[in-house]
Curated annotation (Swiss-Prot):
The keyword Coiled coil does not apply. The gene is rpmG. NCBIfam families: PRK00595.1 (NF001860), rpmG_bact (TIGR01023). Keywords: Ribonucleoprotein, Ribosomal protein. HAMAP family: Ribosomal_bL33. It comes from Stenotrophomonas maltophilia (strain K279a). One of its GO terms (molecular function) is structural constituent of ribosome. SUPFAM superfamilies: Zn-binding ribosomal proteins. Coiled coil: none annotated. This is Large ribosomal subunit protein bL33.
Amino acid sequence: MAGKRDKVRMISSAGTGHFYTTDKNKKNTPGKMEFLKYDPVVRKHVLYKEGKIK
């Protein structure tokens, strides 16, 4: 039986191409996740939005 958590990719909104990978519970978090996280390319905290892992 498959797990309840999906792997997702958090993509930087600064357009640098930097991303974090994490997982989320589909049942508890049905919408798209958004976090303020550190982007080392621009050296600032920027908004990261959920995207698909290819």
